[in-house]
Regions:
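SAM/dcSAM-binding transferase cores
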Residues: 474-532
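Alpha-helical transmembrane segments of multi-pass membrane proteins
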Residues: 1-461, 466-475, 527-532
């Protein structure tokens, strides 16, 4: 038998709370709504921060500004709630529907906007991002005071003010705690950001429907409110059903070409395109390689260090889960074992099993000489007691502080301890032309831990001028020979890679340390100028 409707509004009476008894369905609905409000509000906040980090870089800055905007907007909403004096339940229901609709569709809207706007329209995307975050914050800020006032007005005999505030805030913080754990561990890995947003929008709308039914005796224009609930639920349900198609269409528009892989791991969005021009790998929307010229990058990264060593037997590759650096390392017949430390197991599985991708790396990931360790390189270096003749560091660019720590003195000290006597480490170090100071910051960081450095660069058409640094306890010398079959690197051409024209020449730069992470800020600033 359905619960009875709540009687029409009665005047509030300032009396002590009644003895504890069985909670009514209406009270439960309102307290559950507080739980859902907190959970959904935090999800929308986290989704906006995650999207901003993926699409704009610098996760600390993006999450800080998104959270700050959201909390400030909640304060505005709470202040504005004083001006809502009548029809509290109806106003709460409408706000709940708006939060569900706007918040639920926000990740999809931001994703579409980013893929539809021109590359130089970053400011327009930021305006949309913070406008949506602020709007949701204001609406959520309105809801909690309204719930308290509804509970106090309808159930004044049961709730003393101190108990009311305690109960509401308890449910509020419980909702925030549970979703903070479930968002990264459950929802995003299994639903993705777009469908996670829509799912929680549906939760908001479901609470609105429950409130509509329980307070039907008080609500004016019940049919109109019911139609609004049905409309919001319908829009969100259609969006949920079409979320995959929406994501596919947006990615097709953004990347162009034929997408042969579109998958999400626990760490990143992986997209691989194939067309007449070749195969491209994108991680979180950033190009990682193009098959038509990646050999220039990987030959330049690997062979100057390995060939100069003379007799490398044990090699460590950090990053490079696509296996392309491994392919070049395995050209050296004297190498007995290569250890690949790659954070994302999805990457190594994909590039080992997908026929087109495994063909690019020559099946390197399946080689008997290769040992794959899927873990964080920083932690692994801290714990290992192994040593290696050559260490190849092939991490993504330092676009955020998580990646930036892999370019710090602390990291290079750990790597130095893993170098065997006479060994070399080689690091990819972004573009010395576009990010000149960033490049020389990496060089200065390696030198700050006592290593001798040899900076060099190569032209990779997909990226332009790209930089590398060889570091070790002994100075680097030009090798006597290179492996056969290389397509770009030659002994005669190596000296030219060591020459830096005036627009790439060394500039003063401080070492990048965990305590300052200057490289992330410098990198963001320099590449930001190119994108504006």
């Amino acid at each position: 038998m359905p619960p009875a409707a709540v009687p029409a509004q009665t005047p509030a009476v300032n009396t002590p709370a009644a003895p504890p008894g069985r909670i009514s369905p209406a009270e439960l609905a309102l307290l559950v709504s507080v739980f859902v409000i907190a959970a959904c509000g935090l999800v929308y906040e986290l989704a906006a921060g995650a999207l901003a980090s993926w699409l704009l870089g610098d996760s600390v800055l993006q999450f800080s500004t998104v959270i700050g905007t959201y909390l400030f907007a909640m304060g505005i909403g709470s202040w504005l709630s004083r001006y809502i004096e009548r029809q509290l339940v109806a106003q709460f229901l409408r706000i709940e529907l708006l939060v569900g609709l706007i918040g639920g569709l926000m990740p999809a809207a931001l994703f579409l906007a980013h893929n539809s706007l021109p590359a130089d329209a970053g400011a327009a995307f930021r305006v949309l991002l913070y406008a949506l975050v602020a709007l949701i914050g204001v609406l959520v800020g309105l809801e909690i005071p309204l719930v308290m006032r509804i509970l106090k007005r309808h159930f004044s005999q049961r709730w003393a003010l101190r108990e009311l505030v305690s109960e509401v805030l308890t449910f509020d913080y419980l909702g925030a705690l549970l979703v903070a754990l479930a968002f990264p561990l459950l929802f995003v890995p299994h639903l993705g950001l777009v469908r996670t947003g829509i799912f929680f929008g549906l939760l908001n709308a479901a609470v609105a429907v429950w409130v509509l039914w329980l307070f039907r005796g008080e609500l004016r224009r019940f049919a109109l409110h019911a139609a609004a609930c049905a409309a919001v639920l319908g829009v969100l349900a259609v969006a949920m059903l079409g979320a995959e198609r929406l994501t596919t269409w947006a990615e097709d528009s953004f990347y162009g070409g034929d997408i042969i892989v579109r998958e999400s791991s626990d760490y990143q969005r992986v997209v691989v395109t194939a067309g007449s021009g070749g195969v491209r790998l994108y991680l979180n929307g950033n190009l990682q390689f193009h098959s038509r010229d990646e050999y220039r990058y990987h030959e330049s990264l690997v062979h100057p260090a390995l060939a100069a060593h003379g007799a490398p037997r044990r090699v460590l590759v950090l990053g490079g889960g696509d296996g392309l650096a491994l392919r070049e390392v395995l050209r050296h017949p004297g190498v007995e074992q290569v250890t690949l430390v790659e954070l994302d197991p999805h990457m190594t599985r994909l590039f080992a099993s997908h026929p087109a991708l495994a063909a690019l790396n020559g099946g390197a990931l399946a080689s008997a000489r290769v040992r794959i360790v899927n873990t964080d390189a920083y932690t692994w270096l801290e714990q290992t007691d192994e040593t290696f003749d050559v260490i190849v560091v092939d991490f993504p660019d330092p676009t955020n502080f998580s990646l930036g720590k892999l370019y710090t003195t602390s990291f290079y000290q750990r790597a130095d301890r893993a170098l065997a006597a006479g060994g070399y480490m080689v690091v990819q170090t972004t573009s010395p032309l576009i990010a000149r100071k960033s490049y020389w910051t990496v060089v200065a960081t390696l030198e700050a831990v006592g290593l001798s450095t040899t900076p060099y660069h190569a032209h990779v058409p997909s990226f332009g001028e790209w930089g590398f640094v060889i570091a070790g306890r002994r100075p680097w010398r030009l090798p006597a020979a290179l492996p056969p079959g290389l397509r770009f690197l030659t002994l005669e051409g190596l000296p030219a890679l060591l020459q830096f024209p005036p627009d790439m020449a060394r500039v003063p730069a401080a070492a990048n340390r965990l305590s300052n992470q200057v490289l992330v800020h410098t990198f963001e600033e320099e590449w930001g100028r190119v994108q504006r």
